[in-house]
Amino acid sequence: MKEKVFINSTLAKNEKILFTYDLHWIVWVRVVLLLIVGLLTLPILIGVIFLIAAIFSILSIKGTEYGITDKKIVGKTGFIFRRNIDLRLNKIESVILDQGIFGRMFGYGHIVFNGTGSGKNGFLFVQNPMLVKNQINQVLEDIEEKK
């Protein structure tokens, strides 16, 4: 598991990382397909476009971090086009697991957070999404018990 540089950089004083999550290997299938098509069609412009798309996909995958601290849900996707998630735990209304047939077969899914005043945010293509959802719900329950 790689170090979560972005998540560490968002920590407040005395804030602790509880869990970090990695992307499922399935995200690399798109990269491989883009590379294959790009290399096969390289003599023409479309090949270059596919190779550039593959590079952008690699940078996006490498730039993705997801985690939960004792105070918030935090995440970052992308490298060039970046999207940050910073959602206070006390603002989360629901945690939804979105997993299609391929996700169930291969063990990946999307975790969607509905927050007050923030709309929907989520972790896409996470490994073992049921475990992720259960861990997040447990943290939310622990916070409710402390109130």
Regions found by a protein language model. Give the residues of each.
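N-terminal basic, Ser/Thr-rich segments that initiate or prime the first beta/alpha elements at protein or domain
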Residues: 1-147
